[in-house]
A protein has these predicted regions:
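Phosphate-group recognition and catalysis centered on beta-loop-alpha active-site segments
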Residues: 2-346
């Protein structure tokens, strides 16, 4: 009997609880729709998943843009440094044969025009005549003057070369279009520029024999303290190094026309300058040569876009046939860098 009473009591409690929940549900369903919407528990109790996504979104908005702009700013500074750092140590503007865009190469007119364009240095071609006189002349220029595509400076005597120069002067109606000797050229330009490059050409009939001695002799006679001698012939470069410790010497890096392979970058230890054919120049090459305390000169750069590229590579000198255009490009880049906020170190 007692067990039956307990069972009834249990069912009675469960029934009461069920009825209470039922009545609460009924009251809630009878609330106006507007009050149900404003129910605080519905309004302020988002699901955990929604809350998590909201938190992730807010974190993304707070963190990603500053990081993005930080890296963009860093990239901008790196690009600006690459583009503008040369302003702290500008390269020499080296006039190839003088201003050979506006005058015939290696003539007094070309040298005078280069000096007027504020070139820092002038490159003079050095070739030896049949009778051993050094002329400021390249074989290709002799061929143009003579009209003979096979002419070489070493095939002609001093008198013959001077005769061709006189005829060339008459054709151009200028007293400064004749062919100068290297001594005449050095006397004219060496005190007007920071550096003179003597680009020594090896040719018949004696080739390298005695050429280093002849070049050093004219350097000494003209007292050219700012002369740099370089050549494509490593034998000649080594001869000059062996005979004199006072003259700055360089060697040439280019692609061997026979093998298609670039010359060894570090092949002459005592040479202080390396003249590099401009398509070969990049940051890695410049870094390698700088680590060996060698200056990097590019040749021959006449295109304005390539001039800019050489500036960005931070080399020491740019050899060009058009020094005026190079000066204009340098000024344009300088102006843009300063407008972008680059600070030149003093």
């Amino acid at each position: 009997m007692k067990a039956t009473h307990n069972t009834l009591t249990h069912f009675s409690k469960k029934g009461n609880a069920f009825m209470a929940r039922f009545l609460r549900r009924q009251r809630h369903q009878q609330l106006p729709q507007s009050l149900q919407i404003l129910n605080p528990r519905r309004l302020f109790s988002p699901s955990r998943r929604a809350f998590r996504w909201l938190l992730i979104t807010l974190t993304f908005i707070a963190v990603v843009p500053p990081v993005f702009f930080h890296f963009r700013l860093r990239h901008f500074h790196q690009m600006q440094l690459k583009k503008c750092d040369w302003l702290n140590d500008p390269p020499f503007v080296c006039a190839h044969g003088g201003d050979s865009i506006n005058a015939f190469p290696n003539t007094m007119d070309a040298y005078r025009s280069a000096i007027h364009s504020q070139a820092d240095c002038i490159e003079i071609d050095v070739s030896r005549s049949l009778d051993g006189v050094l002329f400021a002349l390249h074989d290709r220029d002799l061929q143009q003057i003579s009209g003979n595509s096979s002419s070489k400076v070493g095939h002609l005597s001093m008198k013959e070369i001077k005769g061709l120069g006189a005829a060339h002067r008459v054709d151009h109606k200028s007293n400064d279009q004749e062919i100068p000797t290297v001594e005449e050229a050095l006397t004219f330009v060496s005190n007007s520029v920071t550096q003179v490059i003597l680009d020594a050409k090896v040719g018949p009939p004696m080739y390298e024999k005695g050429l280093a001695k002849d070049i050093l002799s004219v350097v000494q006679r003209t007292r050219c303290k700012n002369c740099l001698v370089w050549a494509k012939s490593d034998n000649l470069v080594r001869d000059i190094i062996r005979l004199s410790s006072d003259v700055t010497v360089g060697y040439i890096v280019m692609v061997d026309p026979k093998t298609g392979i670039r010359n060894n970058l570090l092949r002459i230890k005592k040479a202080k300058v390396v003249g590099v054919y401009h398509p070969l120049i990049d940051g890695k090459l410049v870094s390698i040569l700088r680590r060996r305390n060698k200056k990097v000169y590019s040749w021959t750069v006449d295109d304005e876009d390539l001039m800019r590229k050489m500036l960005y590579e931070g080399i020491d000198a740019i050899v060009t046939s058009d020094p005026t255009s190079l000066r204009v490009v340098m000024q344009e880049v300088r102006t843009q860098c300063l407008e972008d906020g680059f600070s030149v170190q003093r």
